């Protein structure tokens, strides 16, 4: 993103310098037995190839796509997020994985192999069918029967409890439904986007910086998750490209409001103490009802910084999306 906007070689070289390590990670199997190949390899290697034609970046991104394909479960038609394949305790998808699908769409376009695309579409359909509740809030994760593939139940991992609204999960739903429509222009994804976005906006506190879970409201003193607002803004700006002008204008206006709030309340304005950009993100917050330990609470996060920058770029440039 920095190189695209400035054309300064220092940013380009710093990014390309990372590509060999991304390939090495796959070859040596360094924490790659999970679904997050798109998050790792789309804004790095796919972006590098699109912008510079770097052949190693292309090769590495295709390796990552193949690694992700290995996690697809035919019984249930979804990508298993975590754990040993087929383990009943981990036979589930998570809403985050919608952002991993563009890696497969890119691989399909790049290789002319439709299997990548077809598999991504199956996962998207399964996800949107099961993680979105009747009130348009979302589950973080959803379990399936490993023997039959039948849907079982929605539960949380990083949210406050199973029935609450994990803020970042809701934001993934916003961006994920926009991406779904980009690659499969079915009106049902626009309708899902509208409803998921409305639910997100209805639960925002006064200063527009989401609490880590929407169970919490103003006065609770609970940590925020600024990254959720940045992700949601990106999703609104993406979907605006496919909507009628008046509706698109409303979502663009809302995205700008979120970004102004992030800039006012969360932008780190000093070069001391941290190399982060966006304060007040939360990776995982423990609760009496979830399974995580406190990790990255009220800190800068890689994805918070990235999606904040992406949203800003979307506002100032005709940007070719990495996703």
What do these predicted regions represent?
Residues 1-323:
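Glycan-recognition and catalytic cores of secretory/periplasmic carbohydrate-active enzymes
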């Amino acid at each position: 993103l920095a190189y695209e906007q400035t054309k300064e070689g220092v940013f380009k070289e710093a990014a390309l310098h990372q590509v060999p390590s991304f390939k090495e990670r796959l070859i040596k199997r360094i924490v790659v037995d999970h679904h997050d190949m798109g998050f790792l390899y789309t804004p790095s290697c796919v972006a590098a190839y699109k912008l510079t034609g770097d052949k190693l970046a292309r090769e590495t991104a295709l390796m990552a796509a193949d690694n992700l394909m290995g996690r697809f479960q035919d019984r249930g038609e979804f990508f298993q997020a975590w754990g040993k394949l087929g383990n009943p305790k981990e036979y589930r998808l998570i809403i985050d994985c919608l952002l991993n699908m563009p890696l497969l769409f890119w691989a399909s376009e790049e290789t002319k192999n439709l299997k990548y695309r077809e598999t991504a579409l199956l996962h998207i359909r399964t996800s949107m069918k099961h993680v979105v509740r009747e009130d348009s809030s979302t589950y973080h994760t959803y379990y399936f029967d490993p023997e039959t593939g039948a849907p079982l139940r929605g539960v949380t991992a990083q949210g406050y409890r199973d029935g609450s609204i994990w803020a970042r999960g809701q934001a993934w739903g916003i961006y994920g439904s926009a991406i779904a429509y980009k690659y499969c222009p079915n009106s049902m994804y626009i309708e899902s986007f509208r409803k998921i976005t409305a639910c997100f906006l209805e639960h925002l506190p006064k200063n527009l910086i989401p609490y880590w879970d929407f169970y919490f409201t103003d006065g609770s003193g609970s940590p925020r998750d600024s990254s959720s607002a940045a992700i949601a803004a990106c999703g609104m700006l993406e979907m605006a490209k496919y909507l009628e002008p008046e509706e698109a204008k409303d979502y663009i206006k809302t995205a700008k409001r979120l970004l102004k709030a992030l800039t006012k309340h969360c932008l780190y304005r000093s070069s001391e103490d941290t190399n982060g950009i966006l304060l007040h993100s939360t990776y995982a917050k423990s609760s009496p009802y979830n399974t995580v330990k406190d990790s990255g609470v009220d800190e800068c996060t890689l994805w918070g910084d990235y999606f904040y920058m992406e949203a800003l770029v979307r506002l100032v440039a005709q940007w070719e999306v990495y996703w």
